[in-house]
Amino acid sequence: MKLYHGSHVEVRNPKILTSSRVGDFGSGFYTTSSMKQALRWAEIRAQQTKSASGVVTVFEVPDSLFEHPELAVKTFSQADDDWLDFVLANRQDTAFEHHFDLVRGPVANDRVYVCLNALENGTADRATVLRRLKTFVLADQIFFHTAKSLLFLEYVSTEVVPCSKP
């Protein structure tokens, strides 16, 4: 199975990096099975860093990756109650830790962030946010949280993506 990582730099040898900006599933290495989503991430990162181009790095993983007996895997099939709890814990609770090697599920896009921010600042309740989330078609993200999980990523290629100026 091919996975894509969008950034402003090529990433041949991914690492688990901690950041002050924690993603939906925590600190780690984010990929997607959607080239379209990776292209979007690459353009966003290029604009954030004022780079002329973004980069999509392509990886291959075994088709059976999510069933591997030595990996702790969490799968969210949709943006539901459990997904919302997990994402909010990662966003809000600096002490929150999970012990999954891999997490896969919907990626929070701009529309989802508007909903999450509304929930966090009290302008929308949980039921309203969950109802809105059900109407969104969301790309996936496959998150590598441990060094052990990164061993399954095999570098394939890199695509440089010219980006429009903001």
Task: Report each predicted region and the residues it spans.
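Glycine-rich loop/turn
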Residues: 1-29, 37-47
